[in-house]
Amino acid sequence: MTQDELKKAVGWAALQYVQPGTIVGVGTGSTAAHFIDALGTMKGQIEGAVSSSDASTEKLKGLGIHVFDLNEVDSLGIYVDGADEINGHMQMIKGGGAALTREKIIASVAEKFICIADASKQVDILGKFPLPVEVIPMARSAVARQLVKLGGRPEYRQGVVTDNGNVILDVYGMEILDPIALENAINAIPGVVTVGLFANRGADVALIGTPDGVKTIVK
């Protein structure tokens, strides 16, 4: 199976967690896009979705799924999204698609976070994938200096503006042995909107696409 076929398999497998009559939290990226396609087959059974990016909102609306503003929603049963890396503790690096802040907000509201990923995203130690940090534009250089002090090699993601109007620094060279401590340390830097470490709020269920089928890991 190709990588895209593995992503499709986990996207469709996540449908089993969707309850009729509910509002579904939806992530961003190539794997989440397959989940949105699958969700389209249930559009008459769900109330709608909350989306983590303009791109996902457009795709959901194109399939006829009503998209709610998060401010209109009291609670979410599930949030389904991909990951750039996921470790054995269900902690993740996310933000390759620059939607990390909205993803983290929706994940914090949802009762259950379901991570969908192909097996290549499983790692023992987070950090080989560059760690994205969303930053207020005027603070870019100041934040970068602080990230160097934390042992990273930040690079400005040229030409990318987030849906919130901010910029992204990708931090290379991090071997993240204590993801919660690093998430807290980076989030404490003035000018950081959020870091793409999902350690304090990790996944509850991981659906991993393998050549032998979809593997389910429960926290």
Curated annotation (Swiss-Prot):
Single GO MF descriptor: ribose-5-phosphate isomerase activity
Superkingdom classification of source: Bacteria
InterPro entries (UniProt xref): NagB/RpiA_transferase-like, Ribose5P_isomerase_typA_subgr, Ribose5P_isomerase_type_A
Residues bound to substrate: T28, G29, S30, T31, D81, G82, A83, D84, K94, G95, G96, G97, K121
Pathway info: Carbohydrate degradation; pentose phosphate pathway; D-ribose 5-phosphate from D-ribulose 5-phosphate (non-oxidative stage): step 1/1
EC number: 5.3.1.6
Active site: residue positions: E103
Record field: catalytic activity: aldehydo-D-ribose 5-phosphate = D-ribulose 5-phosphate
Gene Ontology CC annotations of this record: cytosol
Gene Ontology biological process terms, A to Z: D-ribose metabolic process; pentose-phosphate shunt, non-oxidative branch
Enzyme class, first EC level, given as a word: isomerase
Keywords, comma-separated and alphabetical: Isomerase
Role, per record: Catalyzes the reversible conversion of ribose-5-phosphate to ribulose 5-phosphate.
Protein family according to the UniProt entry: Belongs to the ribose 5-phosphate isomerase family.
Subunit structure of this chain's protein: Homodimer.
Protein name per UniProt: Ribose-5-phosphate isomerase A
